[in-house]
UniProtKB/Swiss-Prot annotation:
Lineage: Bacteria, Bacillati, Bacillota, Clostridia, Eubacteriales
Top-level taxon: Bacteria
Biological source species: Heliobacterium modesticaldum (strain ATCC 51547 / Ice1)
Protein's UniProt name: Large ribosomal subunit protein bL27
UniProt-listed PROSITE patterns: RIBOSOMAL_L27
GO annotation (BP), single: translation
Length: 92
């Protein structure tokens, strides 16, 4: 009877620390002004990637999908249909 003892070893060195240790910096996305909060014209309301929240009344959409207030007023988060959200600014 022939008994074989096969052992497999790594064919590449287990390199860890020199090739690890990279991560991108946080992008600081999210809601910047909450519902009912007073804002000035130009204030950023939401920073986002894609239009997860849509612009409503008196809210502008930046080239990077940032939502910002067009007038001085109060922030109001609303539903738009069944599955969409929007943010509006209403004058006080």
């Amino acid at each position: 009877m022939l008994v074989m003892n096969l052992q497999y070893f790594a064919h590449k060195k287990g390199v860890g620390s020199s090739r690890n240790g990279r991560d991108s910096e946080a992008k600081r996305l999210g809601v910047k002004r909450s519902d009912g909060q007073a804002v000035l014209s130009g204030n950023i309301l939401v920073r986002q990637r894609g239009t997860k929240i849509h612009p409503g009344n008196n809210v502008g959409l930046g080239s990077d999908d940032t939502l910002f207030a067009l007038i001085d007023g109060v922030v109001k988060f609303e539903r738009k249909g069944r599955d969409k959200k929007q943010v509006s600014v209403y004058a006080v």
